[in-house]
């Protein structure tokens, strides 16, 4: 909901989907706080089909979403995003270097698989870690190609942990 609200602040017609009715209800309430009624603009995604027509969106955004699910589900979701998107797709994905911030993983290994988070933040959710090869695997069965890609890595200098995210713009050919 936060991106839907942000885009509306800029005067852009925006819509959102989520798998959780609770998240949608919270987004609607959050929107009211900023003076926006987004109730008609947010819908449930049933895990199979995004409830919008083909090429409905000029562009789509997925901020910190596709890495918070099993990789196989992300591959299914990106095909649906491909279906409803006319041209561009912006997404961010957690990088493999970020595994050191999760207590249950060994601190000296690069990890590109997925885990169930045990730490307080997002406890019980799936976290899937990415490198460029895994990103290419994610998009290979879509019409998207990487137009722009950056990886931002931050270091906590006190405990020497790193957190990184890929930021990508995908373009339909």
Give the label of every model feature segment:
Residues 1-49, 73-76, 89-173:
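Class I (Rossmann-like) S-adenosyl-L-methionine-dependent methyltransferase catalytic domain
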Residues 69-72, 85-86:
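Helix-to-beta-strand junctions that scaffold the AdoMet/dcAdoMet cofactor pocket
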